[in-house]
């Protein structure tokens, strides 16, 4: 694919996003009420626009970034607005990444506040969790610090850790320059490995399930989009691996400092390259799950591009076909949209920010 075709698509996407930026710098959805406050979409759009090299686009990204410190207070707290943060971990993690990319005292101070907010939502001993708990070390969708429920009580399902939120939390720590020996990384590995269809001991691997891929969450079949894969030879119910979560898992492993040549990283990378598809979200999806499979197509593209680039996978295997497919799917005017509605990629701001972010990585990896 000619470079100018990708550049034209990226410029068109940036222009479309800029046309939908509010005067205060934020992006707000016209599709979903949960995205109308600005906190959910703004850090995602800012990170996408920061990949551009156009001065006007970078200026708009800075205006969007200026919206984020307004929620950070000098005492280290976050004031999210009248309705709270819809997606606290994603907002905080993407805010940290954007503010650290911009740098400078103003942005760094706000990034530190957002990072503190993020760390308060990791499941740690301070919140009653211990390494004997399978949830220990992960991040979920809790609106407040996710304290361990008292005996006999049930945890809020939204607070339970998942692989996507955990990957974002870990990458924010890296973006903020936290060293690899920071205990947050070790705690997170405890959770990440539990979502990996992989056995450290080759003798204990079940080839029907231990394929090197990842799943989203522990013990929750409906939220694992590929569903239950079956029962292994030890009698355990196993979840099927699928694309977006395997990309998330690979990002998490690398953020935790595992080497590219390590066994877990290699297994996850091989799963992605062996099953890679630019046209569809790959994985062993069970019957009746085609809508869920399609619902995170643009997130799959975004996470896979980040994961494969970070892992050093050969660009020819994925970057060129992914770029071609994304350019083909772009709508007149510069946006993208997913027909599947289950995870709100039918909101064009969501889909466009994800697609353009993936396309930028493809562009930087290809040699013309």
Give the positions of each predicted feature:
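Conserved catalytic core of Hanks-type protein kinase domains
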Residues: 20, 71, 329
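N-terminal capping segment at the start of a domain
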Residues: 19-26
């Amino acid at each position: 694919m000619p470079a100018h075709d990708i550049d034209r698509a990226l410029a068109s996407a940036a222009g479309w996003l800029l046309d939908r930026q509010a005067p205060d710098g934020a992006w707000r959805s016209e599709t979903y009420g949960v995205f109308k406050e600005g906190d959910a979409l703004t850090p995602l759009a800012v990170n996408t626009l920061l990949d551009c090299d156009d001065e006007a686009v970078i200026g708009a990204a800075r205006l969007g970034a200026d919206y984020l410190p307004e929620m950070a207070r000098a005492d280290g707290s976050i004031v999210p607005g009248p309705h709270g943060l819809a997606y606290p971990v994603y907002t905080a993690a993407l805010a940290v990444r954007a503010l650290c990319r911009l740098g400078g005292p103003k942005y760094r101070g706000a990034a530190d506040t957002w990072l503190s907010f993020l760390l308060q939502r990791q499941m740690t001993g301070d919140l009653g969790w211990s390494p004997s708990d399978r949830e220990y070390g992960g991040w979920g969708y809790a609106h407040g610090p996710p304290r361990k429920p008292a005996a006999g009580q049930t945890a809020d399902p939204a607070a339970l850790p998942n692989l996507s939120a955990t990957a974002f939390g870990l990458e924010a720590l890296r973006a903020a320059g936290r060293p690899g020996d920071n205990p947050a990384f070790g705690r997170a590995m405890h959770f990440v490995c539990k979502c990996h269809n992989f056995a450290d001991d080759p003798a204990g691997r079940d080839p029907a399930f231990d394929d090197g891929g990842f799943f989203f969450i522990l013990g929750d079949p409906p939220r694992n989009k590929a569903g239950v894969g079956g029962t292994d030879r030890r009698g355990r119910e196993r979840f099927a691996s699928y694309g977006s979560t395997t990309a998330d898992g690979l990002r998490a492993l690398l953020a935790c400092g595992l080497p590219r040549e390590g066994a877990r990283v290699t297994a996850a990378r091989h799963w992605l390259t062996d099953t890679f598809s630019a046209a569809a979200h790959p994985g062993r999806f069970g019957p009746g799950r085609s809508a869920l499979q399609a619902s995170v197509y643009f997130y799959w593209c975004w996470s896979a591009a980040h994961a494969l680039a970070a892992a050093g996978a050969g660009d020819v295997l994925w970057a060129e076909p992914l770029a071609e497919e994304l350019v083909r799917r772009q709508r007149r005017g510069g946006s993208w949209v997913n027909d599947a509605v289950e995870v709100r990629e039918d909101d064009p701001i969501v889909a466009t920010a994800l697609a353009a972010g993936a396309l930028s990585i493809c562009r930087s990896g290809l040699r013309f």
